[in-house]
Amino acid sequence: MKKTLVVFCVISITALLAAFLSAQDRKADLQKWAVHDESRPLPPVVDPGPAGPPAPLPADAIVLFSGKDLSAWVNGKNEPAKWKVENGYMEAVKGTGSIQTKQGFGDCQLHVEWATPSEVVGTSQGRGNSGVFLMNTYEVQVLDGYDNKTYADGMAASIYGQYPPLVNACRKPGEWQMYD
């Protein structure tokens, strides 16, 4: 009985130590890159595949933009959003600031469809740059990433300034993109 207990304790301690060291390795990997570190490896460029119709909405989806109006949105002062809505999309208007949903969210599955301007103007972060903020803290980057070199943690679909996307699957400027 004592021998079994000792073996059990040794195995348990070994498993806990292995889990601790593994977590430290992941933490060290994240900490070895500075924010916007130009030497951080870029994710591979992949073909996004053919554009097609969007998949059906999940039964419990909350649609925040119907293509018709900004009724689910307000500006930073909790006033009606003043972005432009036309042809089924919304577009930021210079000087109107950011917008946010009226409804608050915690855990969610985010689906974003977006397009950058078809006329290429600027480079790096100055080219079709926007983002989706989660909980006023984390930004999921929206950026023209097609043939546009920038730092890894600032690419389209990155958690801006923190973690790069796994791949760069950006389409050409002006084409609709999406990510989940």
Where are these regions (language model features)?
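Positively charged n-region of N-terminal signal peptides that target proteins for export
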Residues: M1-T4
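Carbohydrate-interacting regions of secretory-pathway proteins
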Residues: F20-D180
